[in-house]
Amino acid sequence: MAGTTSIEKSEILSRLLDKEGIKHNVLNAKNHEKEAEIIAQAGKFGAVTVATNMAGRGTDIMLGGNAEFLAKNDLKKAGFTPDLIAEATGFAETDNETILKARKMFSDAEDKYRKELAPEADKVREAGGLFILGTERHESRRIDNQLRGRSGRQGDPGESRFYLCMEDDIMRLFGTERMQKMMETLKIDDDTPIDAKILSGAIENAQKKVESKNFQARKNTLEYDDM
């Protein structure tokens, strides 16, 4: 999964992938009606997903595919209403025959899909799990951490790596001269990862500056509204 900081950048990356003939899905606010389906497929072997960092948050990406989503989709295709599907996936006690029938159908379908998806889930785990590629650092550390947290869920393997450029918004606005000089001194090619604490610390300081600036702007707005 490749995380971007805006819809515009997710679409630019999507066009570049199209140009290279790489099949992928795009998850952003423009595609919200397909969000559940894209998230459900994002953990399949070989799946490539481009997402804005906030899109689909709160939904775990299941390695191999999401059996629960596929089972719910079966109920939808069978003509069950959204309210009945919600009841079918719930646990409240009931003697309503329609709900009980829907629950039985959902349970059977979920078990079937879990068995079907298990070999693919193992294949994804053996390959290292979900790989998160951050195309740049967000101005908020919290959002960066949410993107990182999409991989390695529930004991599954996973990895995340952010790729930075001195022309990224946060680096351009708050990247220090010291950082620029350090990059020039190291003379490392673009394919070599840099895991230096001094670089991580400089980026974190830049994010703190942005967060502080945004907080002050919100505070000033509230004070103005209270006048």
Please place each PLM-identified region on the residue numbering.
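Conserved strand-helix element at the start of the C-terminal RecA-like helicase core
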Residues: 1-13
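Short acidic, glycine/proline-enriched loop segments that cap or flank alpha-helices
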Residues: 1-4, 194, 219-223
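A glycine-rich phosphate-binding loop feature that marks nucleotide/adenosyl-phosphate handling sites
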Residues: 5-7, 199-203, 223-227
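Conserved phosphate-handling catalytic cores of large alpha/beta enzymes
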Residues: 18-214
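C-terminal accessory/connector segments of nucleic-acid motor ATPases
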Residues: 208-227
